[in-house]
Curated annotation (Swiss-Prot):
GO terms for biological process: activin receptor signaling pathway; apoptotic process; cell differentiation; cellular response to growth factor stimulus; heart development; nervous system development. This is TGF-beta receptor type-2. It comes from the Eukaryota. Keywords: Apoptosis, ATP-binding, Cell membrane, Differentiation, Disulfide bond, Glycoprotein, Growth regulation, Kinase, Magnesium, Manganese, Membrane, Metal-binding, Nucleotide-binding, Phosphoprotein, Receptor, Serine/threonine-protein kinase, Signal, Transferase, Transmembrane, Transmembrane helix. It comes from Sus scrofa (Pig). The gene is TGFBR2. One of its GO terms (cellular component) is activin receptor complex. Residues 24-166 are extracellular. ATP binds at V250, G251, K252, G253, R254, F255, A256, E257, V258, K277.
Length: 297
């Protein structure tokens, strides 16, 4: 009977304690162990720090730019307010690195941890007795594993490659664009000039007697012509205009075109079939070269 009554009153007891706890004013101080619970500036509970913790170990790290502690032990700091600390020493015998947790309110090796709020462990030289002494502290997890000796390196290193690529791209983009534009312009000029030097002549229309003033040079192919020797001897191939009527296009090359033509004999209706090679005015040098060759034969 008694146990049943107590069992029925237990839920009521829990509800009453819940109601009482909810009515406690927020300004009433609560008993909390300050060593076990620390809050940040926003009022959030701060958890203990994760730091490299290898005490003192020999190292090959020099005090140039940055290096790693090579500590394989990661420890949870004993108190939430403790931060990560790294100490680099160099004396006549060896180089050592020390990685520990420590409270920034307490001096370490006689020096105040004035950089405890930093997220990176940037070394600062301290005046030690008979040795080179650097120390740093930081407040991010395992931040004392990567120790940095140059503030400039610490500032630029994370985005160093990105900055280099950006600067290089911005620097090279204008010259590259100009170079591409020059290449395209030169290519278009070459294509246009070649088309101008080798025009597509209309071969569908029969060509009439052409004069030298029309910028065309006409050469009579003596060795392939059936013209009579009397007519051929009476013609000066170099200075006289020939009574030629072009017939059909036989072939076309890079520098000239070859036509089948009719060589009129005086004013009569008689003619001889000849081959005529025609050079455009722009290919005067090629025409002169061939003329000199045939003149020497």
């Amino acid at each position: 009977m008694g146990r049943g009554l107590l069992g029925g009153l237990w839920p009521l007891h829990v509800v009453l304690w819940t109601r009482i706890a909810s009515t406690i004013p927020p300004h009433v101080p609560k008993s909390v162990n300050s060593d076990m619970m620390v809050t940040d500036s926003n009022g959030a509970v701060k958890l203990p720090q994760l730091c490299k913790f290898c005490d003192v170990r020999s190292s090959t790290c020099d005090n140039q730019k940055s290096c790693l502690s090579n500590c394989s032990i990661t420890a949870i700091c004993e108190k939430p307010q403790e931060v990560c600390v790294a100490v680099w020493r160099k004396n006549d015998e060896n180089i050592t690195i020390e990685t520990v947790c420590d409270d920034p309110k307490i001096a370490y090796h006689g020096f105040v941890l004035d950089d405890a709020a930093s997220s990176k462990c940037i070394m600062k030289e301290r005046k030690g007795s008979g040795e080179t002494f650097f120390m740093c502290s930081c407040s991010s997890d395992e931040c004392n594993d990567h120790i940095i000796f140059s503030e400039e390196y610490a500032t630029n290193n994370p985005d160093l490659l990105l900055v280099i690529f950006q600067v290089t791209g911005v620097s090279l983009l204008p010259p590259l664009g100009i170079a591409i534009a020059v290449i395209i312009t030169f290519y278009c000029y070459r294509v246009h000039r070649q088309q101008k030097l080798s025009p597509s002549w209309d071969s569908g229309k029969p060509r009439k007697l052409m004069e030298f003033s029309e910028h065309l040079a006409i050469i009579l192919e003596d060795d392939r012509s059936d013209i009579s020797s009397t007519c051929a001897n009476n013609i000066n191939h170099n200075t006289e205009l020939l009574p030629i009527e072009l017939d059909t296009l036989v072939g076309k090359g890079r520098f000239a075109e070859v036509y089948k033509a009719k060589l009129r004999q005086n004013t009569s209706e008689q003619f001889e079939t000849v081959a005529v090679k025609i050079f455009p005015y722009e290919e005067y040098a090629s025409w002169k070269t061939e003329k000199d060759i045939f003149s020497d034969l």
